[in-house]
Amino acid sequence: LKQYQAGLLTIKINNGGITNVSNTYSSPERTVIIVDGIFMKETPFNANWSFDINNTDDQFKFIGHVGKLELSDMNVFLTPLLNAKVKGEVIASNFTINGNFDESVINISQEFKDVDVTLLNKKKKEKELLSAVANAVLNDNSGEKGNLLHNATTQAKRDRTKSFFNYLAKNLINGVKVNFLRKNNTVTKEKKKKRN
């Protein structure tokens, strides 16, 4: 059997709250879980997960915002699993997942710059040709001088043998893959809204 070394993700919850925790509420009243914290080294995030506990299809909505992420912080996760390293910066990510027990749709928008991928062999040495090909098909910036958001919509199917958090991760991975691929027709661009 081939063994895989585990990748490491670090999530620290700073604050959290739950409202309407009971099966006595009637639709459309929803249970709402709100959390904020730190992802990996110092990336702030917040999330709002809502669902109707009486809905037999387990319909839910998960809204999240992830702040500035140095992509090199992700290498402790990516290198053991994928024999890859990344660098660059995701300035902001916003996403909404609407789904049920079986399938979901994620809408994700991201601002990013200077993205670069290095593919590695088993000895963790760079595969130069494959790395060059990978970088040729990736978006390295979301727009000139960071003035564009990349928006993407994609889907995920749930593996019923795994947890909701595996399902959430699958949505995010699918969304990020679509967003970073240059030649994918589902990606659209729009001007970033000016912050007040």
Where are these regions (language model features)?
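Short acidic, gly/pro-rich beta-turn/loop elements at beta-sheet edges
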Residues: 21, 45-47, 57-59, 72-74, ...
